[in-house]
Amino acid sequence: MKLIIFTGLVLFAIVSLIEVQADNERACLPQYQVCTDAPGNCCSNLVCNCYGRYKSGARIGRNCFCLQKGVIYKREN
């Protein structure tokens, strides 16, 4: 009985380690990629910045992109 419980715990630990490793290996989003649905997936040197979209003063949506940390983007005329 103890052997069955021990074997079950060992298998559980192995499966847990495999899942954690798979999460750590997930690809990060590179610069300028859309991160609206996954704000935490930008690569380490990037941050997910979101901007509202407006038409005639009414908000019509939101866009989020992986951009460099500390960089300010301004609209050019």
UniProtKB/Swiss-Prot annotation:
Q: One Pfam family for this entry, by name?
A: Toxin_35
Q: Where in the cell is it found?
A: Secreted
| The keyword Cytoplasm is annotated on this UniProt entry | no
UniProtKB keywords: Disulfide bond, Secreted, Signal, Toxin
Which residue numbers fall in the propeptide? 21-26
Q: Which residues form the signal peptide?
A: 1-20
Transmembrane segments in this chain: where? none
Q: Which GO terms describe its molecular function?
A: toxin activity
PTM field: Contains 4 disulfide bonds.
Query: What's the main place this protein lives?
Result: secreted
Q: What tissue specificity is annotated for this entry? A: Expressed by the venom gland.
Q: Does the record's keyword annotation contain Signal?
A: yes
In the UniProt record, which is one GO cellular component term? extracellular region
The entry assigns this protein to a family as follows: Belongs to the neurotoxin 19 (CSTX) family. 08 (U8-Lctx) subfamily.
- Protein name, per record: U8-lycotoxin-Ls1g
Which species? Lycosa singoriensis
